UniProtKB/Swiss-Prot annotation:
Pfam family, one: TIM
Gene name tied to this protein: tpiA
GO cellular component: cytosol
Location in or out of the cell: Cytoplasm
Binding site for substrate: N9, W10, K11, G173, S213, G234, G235
Any one GO molecular function term: triose-phosphate isomerase activity
Gene3D superfamilies the UniProt entry points to: Aldolase class I
Main subcellular location of this protein, as a coarse class: cytoplasm
InterPro entries: Aldolase_TIM (IPR013785), TIM_sf (IPR035990), TrioseP_Isoase_bac/euk (IPR022896), Triosephosphate_isomerase (IPR000652), Triosephosphate_isomerase_AS (IPR020861)
PROSITE patterns xref list: TIM_1, TIM_2
Protein name: Triosephosphate isomerase
Active-site residues from the entry: H95, E167
Organism: Symbiobacterium thermophilum (strain DSM 24528 / JCM 14929 / IAM 14863 / T)
Length: 256
């Protein structure tokens, strides 16, 4: 059975003091949970504060982006080696905001995934269609294209050990979440692509999250779907009570 993974994507929120306060409120709520892996992905400036606060806990640290370059004259960029040095185990790559606002292509995302793996980081590879693509019936084709580009050059074992996050662009930060049954259909199709390209074992092992307006009140419905293995949580992860409730729902779903 795949262990659920719930990751907090704080985006461009929280100073170091705010991050420390979040942990002070969240960690006591997390302490009794089992059967779920939890990751917090703060902005770069709060990585050190969060890393310190997570010492001795089961909660993992992740980053929200990284360069595909190992080092050099790349102003403003952060390498995989730097993330490892900061204590990161995970890194979010290919988020729709990176693709849409900063022009990251499928090829760039794939290069970042390969670079992350070279540094021992676990990529959380984000894929997802826009509203226009969904309405045109192109969702599965878009997800397939983004997925195969992001996984290009990887071995079945590497694919089995990373995380995929299906985030329909039209559901991110809009309050309009994808129907759990529809999310299951999209994610089952993604898993089928993995099976086709990398084999049934990789497809059975890889964890696939849902993301897009995830809240405490809808998390259980997503976790009831057989192919959904957790969530990549945006806005609701900024509140420790809300995020703890989402994590608890994931843990309870797998305990049944």
């Amino acid at each position: 059975m795949r262990t659920p993974i719930v990751a907090a994507n704080w985006k461009m929120h929280k100073t170091q003091p705010e991050a420390r306060q979040f942990l002070a409120d969240f960690l006591p709520r997390e302490a009794g949970m089992s059967g779920v892996e939890i990751v917090i992905c703060p902005p770069f400036t709060a990585l050190a504060a969060v890393a310190g606060g997570l010492t001795g806990t089961r909660v993992g640290l992740g980053a929200q982006n990284m360069s595909d370059k190992p080092s050099g004259a790349f102003t403003g960029e952060v390498s995989g080696a730097m993330l490892v040095d900061a204590g990161c185990r995970y890194v979010i790559l290919g988020h729709s905001e990176r693709r849409r606002l900063f022009g990251e292509s499928d090829e760039v995302v794939g290069a970042k995934v390969r670079a992350a793996l070279q540094h021992g980081l676990i990529p959380i590879l984000c894929i997802g269609e826009t509203l226009e693509e969904q309405q045109a019936g192109e969702a599965d084709a878009v997800n397939r294209r983004q997925l195969l580009a992001g996984l290009e050059g990887l071995t079945p074992e590497q694919v089995a050990n990373l995380v995929i996050a299906y985030e329909p662009v039209w559901a991110i930060g809009t309050g309009r979440n994808c129907d759990p049954g529809d999310a299951q259909a999209r994610i089952a199709a993604v898993r089928a692509v993995v099976a086709e390209a990398f084999g049934p074992e990789a497809a059975a092992r890889v964890r696939i999250q849902y993301g897009g307006s995830v809240k405490p009140e809808n998390m259980a419905a997503y976790m009831a779907q057989p192919d959904i293995d957790g969530a990549l949580v945006g806005g609701a992860s900024l509140d420790p009570t809300s995020f703890a409730a989402i994590c608890a729902a994931a843990a309870e779903a797998r305990a049944r």
